[in-house]
């Protein structure tokens, strides 16, 4: 199974992260669904949307210090805390990224595989404008890039996995998100998945999210995307196969 690369993970604005590779979950990344929780029984909105948050590193203090100027907050579209819900609303994360909601949809679409049901509840396209060098550096790190151009756009998918079985399962999260015929996101290619490696308890659920890089500099013209969820495991054996492709409308 693959696990979250995890060096940043959880807020919203953009990067959710659970990047590629087989690494521990000791560091948490953050992304655009600030109200999302990786815990199966919780879903709360306590902190503002964030492109990324610092991992436990020497950069942590630097990443927590950004404060927007007064003129940046004197706008009816500014959201100090809470989810970005309407196109045009924006906020700032702690590392200095301005997050502007470009598109949002609530498909509430489901797909099943074995004892698991996946329900996609929200899809958002976020414009991320880095206001600091730290914001650009951490975004590039989170998306496994040498550097990133600002503004950049991220696709965020919020979903819940329901386990209808009598045994706990470890999910491998999202196998891939297909933006179009030529572009596909996965754990090794700019997709940060908070669900990868998490356990869904028997007769329980996991509310979670993922964020991927949609484009740099130019706003993508996405109308639909497709998502495919990976398999799930029990005692290191695959007991749930990957799902079919699920079409999502933005």
PLM region spans:
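Bacterial N-terminal signal peptides that target proteins for export
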Residues: 1-10
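Classic N-terminal secretory signal peptides
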Residues: 12-14
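C-terminal motif of bacterial Sec signal peptides marking the signal peptidase cleavage site
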Residues: 17-21
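Conserved functional micro-motifs across diverse proteins
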Residues: 23-156, 162-175, 183-207, 214-250
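Glycine-rich, phosphate-binding/catalytic loops in enzymes
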Residues: 178
């Amino acid at each position: 199974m693959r696990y979250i690369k995890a060096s940043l993970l959880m807020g919203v604005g953009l990067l959710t992260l659970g990047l590629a590779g087989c690494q521990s979950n000791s560091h948490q990344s953050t992304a655009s669904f600030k109200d999302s929780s990786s815990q199966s029984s919780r879903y709360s909105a306590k902190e503002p949307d964030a492109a990324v948050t610092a991992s436990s590193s020497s950069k942590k203090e630097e990443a927590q210090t950004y404060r927007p100027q007064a003129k940046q907050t004197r706008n009816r579209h500014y959201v100090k805390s809470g989810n970005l819900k309407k196109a045009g609303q924006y906020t700032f994360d702690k590392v200095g990224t301005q997050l502007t909601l470009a598109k949002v949809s609530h498909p509430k679409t489901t797909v099943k595989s074995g004892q698991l049901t996946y329900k996609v509840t929200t899809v958002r396209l976020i414009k991320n404008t880095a206001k600091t060098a730290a914001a650009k550096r951490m975004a590039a790190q989170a998306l496994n890039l040498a550097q990133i151009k600002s503004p950049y756009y991220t696709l965020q998918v919020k979903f819940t996995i329901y386990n209808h079985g009598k045994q706990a399962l470890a999910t491998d999260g999202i196998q891939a998100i297909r933006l179009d015929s030529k572009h596909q996101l996965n754990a090794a290619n700019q997709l940060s998945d908070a669900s990868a490696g998490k356990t869904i308890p028997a007769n329980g659920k996991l509310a979670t999210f993922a964020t991927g890089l949609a484009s740099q500099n130019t706003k993508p013209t996405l109308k639909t995307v497709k998502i495919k969820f990976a398999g799930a495991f029990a005692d290191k054996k695959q007991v749930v196969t990957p799902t079919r492709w699920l079409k999502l409308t933005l």
